[in-house]
A protein has these predicted regions:
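Perimembrane helix-loop-helix junctions
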Residues: 170-197
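Specific aromatic-rich, kink-prone transmembrane helix
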Residues: 127-144, 148-156, 173
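Membrane-interface alpha helices of multi-pass inner-membrane proteins
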Residues: 148-175, 300
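Membrane-water interface signatures at transmembrane helix termini and the short loops
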Residues: 113-124, 269-328
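Transmembrane-helix motifs of polytopic, lipid-linked glycan transferases
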Residues: 75-98, 134-138, 272-274
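Membrane-lumen/periplasm interface segments of specific transmembrane helices
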Residues: 19-29, 191-272
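Signature aromatic-anchored transmembrane alpha helix within multi-pass, membrane-resident enzymes
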Residues: 147-150, 193-198, 333-362
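Aromatic- and kink-enriched transmembrane "portal" helix at the membrane-lumen/periplasm boundary
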Residues: 52, 102-130
Length: 389
């Protein structure tokens, strides 16, 4: 009954997010200098470049059908959001729910964030999330053959062609394969992993070493008759990106985002602490939290090279949450319900109030210098009604 009730409300929640996503994507479509659109306009017409794969597909489609490039981008963005929400619902629908799981799933660091901060909506990390769920589904099958590792390799390669930021989140992908293999590092497994990552590493090499010239960027821009935002940042080197962060950094920003991290991750951290690996080796039972921290560490580099700290927290939380529930669904870990001694926390009404405050009372902003937002769902619905009437 709890699972059925959860699925009903969770589906309603996802439908609401989908409708809000469509509304705000339509607004972004009409904005001639919208950063997200500029990211999708990047293509290979000036030569190979990072983030150009999906833009090249869109460019080629625009030459075949009578829709404009912006219209095709809009359709791709809406389709990506819908497909992501569909995958999310199916990912969680068979899990036996409890209150702490619900708190973790409805954390403001997760699904509501891209809608709360519309400049993040349909950014290219959505392909990272879709790729991760697809790979998690593949490695949820009872037996994994060479063809499944081929799918793994192909999905990762396509994903890095779309968004190179995936490199900092590779540990999450390796995590689910390692735990699927019960941390058995035999020769066959190692060979499969190495072969699977070769195409990914080759693409990464070209992304790092191939740079468009100023004329190449002009050629690319001319192909779509637009040139702004992410398109003009393609030639930025790592040093200049770091300089943008360090020039605006203040210790208060770090403190704020550390608090956002701790509060937003609270439910998930509790869940991990009350879970253990199902293994004959008792020493491994204490390593679960350590493994999650290990997977998280490489992504910390993102906070040094780009100001979008809210996005990085959203990505880390999303992948951490999906990784945990992948392990739970496949019986790689077991969760032991914590015994709540505080009578107030066992009161249903108190839990509902805490749930509303924690899950719908706040959200992180996008840039490191931005303050914390409040009442994200209410504000977005109010904005829609206000602009419609």
């Amino acid at each position: 009954m709890i699972r059925k009730t959860f699925n009903y409300y969770f589906k309603t929640y996802l439908i609401l997010l989908s409708l809000l996503a469509v509304y705000y994507l339509l607004q972004k479509y009409n904005n001639l200098v919208e950063w997200t659109i500029s990211e999708w306009l990047i293509n290979y017409q000036g030569g190979f470049t990072r983030r150009g794969f999906i833009g090249e597909i869109i460019y080629q489609i625009s030459n075949i059908i009578s829709l404009s490039i912006r219209e095709i981008i809009l359709l791709f963005q809406i389709s990506a959001c819908f497909f992501y929400y569909y995958l999310i619902f199916n990912f969680f629908k068979k899990i036996k729910m409890n209150f702490i799981f619900i708190f973790a799933i409805f954390s403001p660091l997760f699904l509501v964030y891209p809608v709360a901060e519309v400049e993040v909506l349909a950014r290219k990390e959505i392909f990272l999330f879709i790729s991760f769920i697809l790979i998690a589904n593949i490695f949820s099958l009872k037996k994994n053959t060479n063809i499944h590792y081929f799918y793994f390799s192909s999905i990762l390669t396509f994903c890095i062609l779309i968004w190179e930021g995936i490199i900092f989140y590779i540990p999450y992908f390796i995590f689910i394969i390692l735990i699927k293999n019960k941390f058995n590092y035999n020769k066959k497994f190692i060979i499969r992993i190495i072969l699977s990552l070769i195409p990914f590493c080759l693409v990464l090499y070209f992304i790092i070493n191939i740079r468009l010239t100023s004329q190449d960027i002009v050629t690319m821009c001319n192909s779509v008759n637009e040139c702004y935002g992410a398109m003009t940042y393609l030639n930025n080197d790592l040093h200049s990106n770091i300089g943008e962060v360090t020039s605006q950094f203040k210790i208060i920003y770090l403190i704020r985002y550390m608090l956002i991290f701790v509060v937003g991750f609270t439910a998930l951290i509790i869940i991990i602490n009350y879970s253990h690996l199902i293994t004959k080796n008792k020493n491994q039972n204490k390593k679960l939290l350590f493994l999650f921290v290990l997977a998280l560490i490489p992504s910390l580099f993102f906070y040094v090279i780009a100001q979008d700290w809210g996005r990085w927290i959203n990505i880390s939380y999303t992948l951490s949450l999906l990784t945990y529930f992948y392990c739970l669904k496949n019986n790689f870990i077991i969760f032991q319900n914590p015994k709540i001694k505080n009578k107030s926390l066992r009161n249903k009404n108190v839990l509902i109030i805490l749930f509303i405050i924690f899950c719908f009372g706040w959200n992180q902003k996008t840039l490191m210098k931005d303050d914390v937002g409040s009442l994200p769902i209410y504000r977005k619905i109010y904005s829609v009604i206000k602009n419609t009437i």
